[in-house]
Amino acid sequence: LFDMKKRVGILTSGGDCPGLNATIRGVAKALYARFGENVEIVGILNGYHGLITGEYKEMCEDDFRGILTLGGTILGTKRTPFKLMRVVEEDKIDKVAAMKKTYKDAKLDCLLCLGGNGTHKTANLLSQEGLNVIGLPKTIDNDIYGTDVTFGFHTAVDIATEVIDRNHTTAGSHSRVM
């Protein structure tokens, strides 16, 4: 499939959730297993903010070791509201043009975007601009259209259930409602 070296960018956007690093690792392992030395992975730092400002780094297989159970995201993330993507603010930066420039400067062939609704709206916008984009659904809200369950959701439910169970026990011990 890859007859010449391809460069794949990965970014995480929005809030962090359980499973981000595991997903990043899984994607990297799958790419290396399938394409070996014919793939290069580029980490976009701090979500779309990094794509706007040109913050990215070349990654190697060692970068993905030891992150399976690590919380957060090794790439960093920032909330960059979708509604502001087309707005040229006082800094006079055309964000869409800046993201396209970084994509081209990094010589990306494809960009994988891990995030929720806003992340996927921006990914769709970039796709409409002619960039090759793949969206990976990530949200503890489990509210992305077309998905049954998003990663991060089950862990959030498990933690919330545990907190409620513990408070229930405490409330019973003190004969009160919490």
Can you say where each PLM-predicted feature lies in the sequence?
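Internal, active-site/partner-interface "lid" segment
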Residues: 168-178
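Short, acidic/small-residue loops that bind anionic groups at enzyme active sites
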Residues: 36, 126-150, 157
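A cross-family phosphate/adenosyl-ligand binding-site feature
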Residues: 1-13, 23-107, 118
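Gly/Ser/Thr-rich loops at beta-strand to alpha-helix junctions
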Residues: 14-18, 114-121
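Glycine-rich, mobile lid/loop segments that gate access to catalytic sites or pores
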Residues: 104, 108-110, 115-119, 127-129, ...
